[in-house]
Regions:
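Conserved catalytic core of the tyrosine transesterase superfamily
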Residues: 1-304
């Protein structure tokens, strides 16, 4: 990438308006989101450079529409195109808010319609989740702790990897609790049930501080990639015949809570979803098959 399209390092005296706008936009984010949006903007900047365009000044909706078509021509799926445009659309939205451009050229750009089959992501049913948790404890104490944090407390992969021994030392209103920082740097406090606390204590051993879950062989703290590998190992040992990710366990925690009769509001708190409609999706994903209208209709006209 040439100097005209570089986003970093931050050198305001030599950066264009487009580059300064990009740095300003990216400064809002951190971690994986920052890296993702940086990559998306670099692709946008590179495409503009290849077509003799300034990435910000003079851009019209037609340019954005052509870029979206370009992404499709590279072989990206519709869902990937929508994801790829998140950073670009945010970039223009905040450039407009900051008064750098008169209008947002991306706000009305047409994106592919992505229709998600709500029954595709099933996670684990009750018996599968039980088997997963049981088998995890037979591997190592680290696998056991990870399985319960994902499958009972519905932690995300990065959240589980970041848990420290000190994070669950407090007691509030008679409950042992775990403190964590979730998506969007939002702090959260969750109660630990006796089975979860038992496996966490087994994993902790005699330690009083430091990362809780470690690589069983090296003893080094785990990262997100380790979490994915550990989940895959547990799934294989539990003879679950499909691919599982850490999100599969989070999904299982939420759907099984709803199946157990947990009210939607309480399930939303468990999942730490900002919007209850997100939690409703987990309920529909399981219920579409179990409570689908075809069952009732078939029984109604069973005599035909």
């Amino acid at each position: 990438m040439s100097a005209s399209t570089m986003l970093l390092p931050f050198q305001p005296s030599s950066m264009s308006t487009a580059q300064l706008a990009a740095v300003s936009f990216l400064a809002r984010y951190s971690g994986r989101t920052h890296r993702l949006y940086t990559y998306q903007l670099k692709r946008w900047f590179a495409w503009c450079e290849g077509n003799g365009l300034d990435p910000l000044v003079g851009i019209q909706r037609a340019h954005v529409e052509v870029y979206i078509r370009h992404l499709g021509a590279t072989g990206l799926m519709d869902s990937s195109i929508v994801t790829m445009m998140h950073g670009v659309r945010g970039y223009f939205r905040f450039a407009h808010i900051d008064g750098l451009i008169a209008a947002d050229p991306a706000v009305y750009a047409r994106l592919p319609k992505v229709h998600r089959d709500e029954s595709r992501t099933q996670g684990l049913d009750r018996l599968e989740l039980i088997r997963f948790l049981q088998v995890a404890q037979t591997l190592t104490v680290h696998h056991g702790a990870l399985a319960f944090l994902l499958g009972i407390n519905a932690l995300r992969a990065s959240e589980a990897a970041a848990v420290r021994v000190e994070d669950y030392s407090d007691t509030l209103r008679g409950y042992r609790v775990i403190h964590l920082v979730g998506k969007g740097n939002k702090p959260a406090t969750m109660p630990l049930t006796v089975p979860v606390l038992r496996v966490l204590e087994a994993c902790r051993g005699e330690r009083t501080s430091g990362p809780l879950i470690r690589r069983p062989l090296s003893g080094k703290p785990v990262d997100r990639r380790d979490v994915y590998r550990m989940v895959a190992r547990i799934a294989k040992a539990a003879a679950i015949p499909r691919h599982l990710s850490p999100h599969s366990l989070r999904h299982a925690a939420i759907t099984n809570a709803l199946d157990a009769g947990v009210p939607l509001r309480d399930a939303q708190i468990l999942a730490r979803h900002a919007d209850p409609r997100t939690t409703e999706h987990y309920d529909r994903a399981r219920g579409n098959l179990d409570r689908h209208g075809v069952h009732f209709l078939t029984a109604y006209v069973a005599g035909v």
